[in-house]
Amino acid sequence: MKLLIENFKKYISEESLGDFSDEGMVNLYHYTNPRNADGKDSLVLDPQYFVTSRGAYSKREWETSRYPRTFFYTDYDNKEPIVDGALLSTSVPTNEIYDLKNDPEGYVEKHRHPTYGLRKQMEWETMMKDIHSSYRGIYYSIGKPNVVAWFNPIEVFPHEK
């Protein structure tokens, strides 16, 4: 069990959600096809879209959990090289996002299987649902960079770099 937790901690990087908080708010950044944002003052991103339409990045996350969510970066310059497009942003209260990287409420321990840990589409799924019952988003890492997965529809705005 100790080895599992140590490996999980290696899986996540050192930055915490608080590093991105400014006066209790976190800026979130999302890239989309430029056609989706052309001439619009704002868009509403709906996590249900993730269920039916996924890019390569989202497909990997889909294998981990099929729980509906929209992905955001906490730093628009710190993204995978493959990610491009029109940049959108929004700000949300930090306290609406659960910091899974530090896991202060022990969700990982609560949901992990005693032998197999957090299995894709199993414990990950129930853990996301449980976190969503108290939070609107979750901060974690799927390698590098860190992301916020938002569980609810959210209004976003065009963002100039």
Protein language model annotation of sequence segments:
Residues 16-65, 79-161:
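Active-site and NAD+-binding cores of ADP-ribose-processing enzymes
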Residues 67-72:
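A short, exposed loop/beta-hairpin motif centered on an aromatic-Gly-Thr core
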Residues 5-15:
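Proteolytic processing junctions in secreted/extracellular precursors
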Residues 76:
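Soluble catalytic regions of membrane-associated enzymes that act on cell-envelope
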